[in-house]
UniProtKB/Swiss-Prot annotation:
It comes from Chlorobaculum tepidum (strain ATCC 49652 / DSM 12025 / NBRC 103806 / TLS). Its cofactor is Fe(3+). GO terms for biological process: alkane catabolic process. Belongs to the rubredoxin family. Monomer. One of its GO terms (molecular function) is iron ion binding. Pfam families: Rubredoxin. CDD domains: rubredoxin. PROSITE patterns: RUBREDOXIN, RUBREDOXIN_LIKE. This is Rubredoxin-2. Binds 1 Fe(3+) ion per subunit. Residues 1-52 form the Rubredoxin-like domain.
């Protein structure tokens, strides 16, 4: 699975681990994240992420 990097703070979203603090289970692809999901570090929206 592809990882995505926040352009604001550098946080890496890894689908293999998900976002436990945001109740996003492991195995959730970036594309499957709800539109309301935000970076857990800086609060940026999905539009601020770039595939790496």
């Amino acid at each position: 699975m592809e990882q995505w990097k926040c352009n604001i703070c550098g946080y890496i979203y890894n689908p293999e681990t998900g976002d436990p603090e945001g109740d996003i289970p492991a195995g959730t692809s970036f594309e499957s994240l709800p539109d309301s999901w935000m970076c857990p570090v800086c609060g940026a929206g999905k539009e601020e992420f770039t595939k790496i």
